[in-house]
């Protein structure tokens, strides 16, 4: 007889399966990514929605929104400071594909990344790991490792992954965290040389960057 509680076994299975699918997409050729990405997006969304949590519980409602709004000006201030320093040391450069469609699409993507991190992975890790700090650290590590082999982005996302998980535990709002991540990601893209982060690409796309 198994000593693993059925619910814990399910959580572990969903973490492994979800992360495996995401990493598989990241390392797939670009033409295959276009097919697999929406499939994985829908599957992970359905798994979360199957839990029948309310919008506030998912972090998509009004709960914590006002109290967490300080995160956005903090992200803007950090962005401004980083751009000032980058300009002084000569690494500041134009954004790759700076049109509205790409920027807005990127911001939507960072909101969904926070949805995956908090509502899919963090929620299950909290049930699997009795220590909240350990769950936050583990979630941040999984988030960062998904950005390999982009080492500079992996280091940055390790910090942000842990910080954003801790902030979500306090405020439980995805909107401020997703938008803050988008701002910081765009800042990273223009302040760190493309030669290091390859237009923020990860997985196979990073290795095939020219």
Task: Describe the function of each predicted region.
Residues 1-57, 189-210:
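N-terminal, membrane-interfacial amphipathic/helix-forming hydrophobic leader that caps
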Residues 18-27, 77-86, 140-149, 182-193:
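Aromatic-anchored segments of alpha-helical transmembrane domains
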Residues 2-18, 38, 52-80, 97-98, ...:
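Interfacial transmembrane-helix boundary/kink motif in multi-pass membrane proteins
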Residues 24, 154-209:
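Functionally important transmembrane alpha-helices
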Residues 30-39, 93-97, 151-158:
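Short, aromatic-rich membrane-interface segments at the entry and exit
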Residues 37-44, 105, 156-164:
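Hydrophobic core segments of transmembrane alpha-helices in multi-pass, intramembrane catalytic enzymes
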